[in-house]
Amino acid sequence: MEPVDPNREPWNHPGSQPKTACTNCYCKKCCYHCQVCFLQKGLGISYGRKKRRQRRSAPPGSKTHQDLIPKQPLSQTQRKPTGPEESKKEVESKAEPDRFD
């Protein structure tokens, strides 16, 4: 290993920058090319600005999924009003007395 020159900046030390440029390839060799390639390609971490993906618009002749649903009124669910007396009676009738006493 070469000795580090104290007069040089850290980014100019030998071995701090790879001899070849970074590529867009995602093979194993290119993923371990340098620290930046490892973070971006190997781990999938990038700190740059994210590009906004545009949604693909539907072709003009196609119908949206909302047009296919027929308009129907929502039905109200009917519930039987049960009071506390009814539920207690049902529980008492279903329960058996303890035979182990």
UniProtKB/Swiss-Prot annotation:
Gene that this polypeptide is encoded by: tat
UniProt entry keywords in alphabetical sequence: Acetylation, Activator, AIDS, Apoptosis, Host cytoplasm, Host nucleus, Host-virus interaction, Inhibition of host innate immune response by virus, Inhibition of host interferon signaling pathway by virus, Interferon antiviral system evasion, Isopeptide bond, Metal-binding, Methylation, Modulation of host chromatin by virus, Modulation of host PP1 activity by virus, Phosphoprotein, RNA-binding, Secreted, Transcription, Transcription regulation, Ubl conjugation, Viral immunoevasion, Zinc
Cross-link (Glycyl lysine isopeptide (Lys-Gly) (interchain with G-Cter in ubiquitin)) at residue(s): 71
GO cellular component: extracellular region; host cell cytoplasm; host cell nucleolus
Span of the annotated motif Nuclear localization signal, RNA-binding (TAR), and protein transduction: 49-57
Note in the entry: HIV-1 lineages are divided in three main groups, M (for Major), O (for Outlier), and N (for New, or Non-M, Non-O). The vast majority of strains found worldwide belong to the group M. Group O seems to be endemic to and largely confined to Cameroon and neighboring countries in West Central Africa, where these viruses represent a small minority of HIV-1 strains. The group N is represented by a limited number of isolates from Cameroonian persons. The group M is further subdivided in 9 clades or subtypes (A to D, F to H, J and K).
Organism the protein comes from: Human immunodeficiency virus type 1 group M subtype J (isolate SE9280)
Subunit structure: Interacts with host CCNT1. Associates with the P-TEFb complex composed at least of Tat, P-TEFb (CDK9 and CCNT1), TAR RNA, RNA Pol II. Recruits the HATs CREBBP, TAF1/TFIID, EP300, PCAF and GCN5L2. Interacts with host KAT5/Tip60; this interaction targets the latter to degradation. Interacts with the host deacetylase SIRT1. Interacts with host capping enzyme RNGTT; this interaction stimulates RNGTT. Binds to host KDR, and to the host integrins ITGAV/ITGB3 and ITGA5/ITGB1. Interacts with host KPNB1/importin beta-1 without previous binding to KPNA1/importin alpha-1. Interacts with EIF2AK2.
Positions of modified residues (N6-acetyllysine): 28, 50-51
TM region(s), chain numbering: none
Annotated spans, Interaction with the host capping enzyme RNGTT: 49-86
This protein's name: Protein Tat
Subcellular location(s) of the protein: Host nucleus, Host nucleolus; Host cytoplasm; Secreted
Reported function: Transcriptional activator that increases RNA Pol II processivity, thereby increasing the level of full-length viral transcripts. Recognizes a hairpin structure at the 5'-LTR of the nascent viral mRNAs referred to as the transactivation responsive RNA element (TAR) and recruits the cyclin T1-CDK9 complex (P-TEFb complex) that will in turn hyperphosphorylate the RNA polymerase II to allow efficient elongation. The CDK9 component of P-TEFb and other Tat-activated kinases hyperphosphorylate the C-terminus of RNA Pol II that becomes stabilized and much more processive. Extracellular circulating Tat can be endocytosed by surrounding uninfected cells via the binding to several surface receptors such as CD26, CXCR4, heparan sulfate proteoglycans (HSPG) or LDLR. Neurons are rarely infected, but they internalize Tat via their LDLR. Through its interaction with nuclear HATs, Tat is potentially able to control the acetylation-dependent cellular gene expression. Modulates the expression of many cellular genes involved in cell survival, proliferation or in coding for cytokines or cytokine receptors. Tat plays a role in T-cell and neurons apoptosis.
Subcellular location, principal: host cell
Residue span of region Interaction with human CREBBP: 1-24
Domain notes: The cell attachment site mediates the interaction with ITGAV/ITGB3 and ITGA5/ITGB1 integrins, leading to vascular cell migration and invasion. This interaction also provides endothelial cells with the adhesion signal they require to grow in response to mitogens.
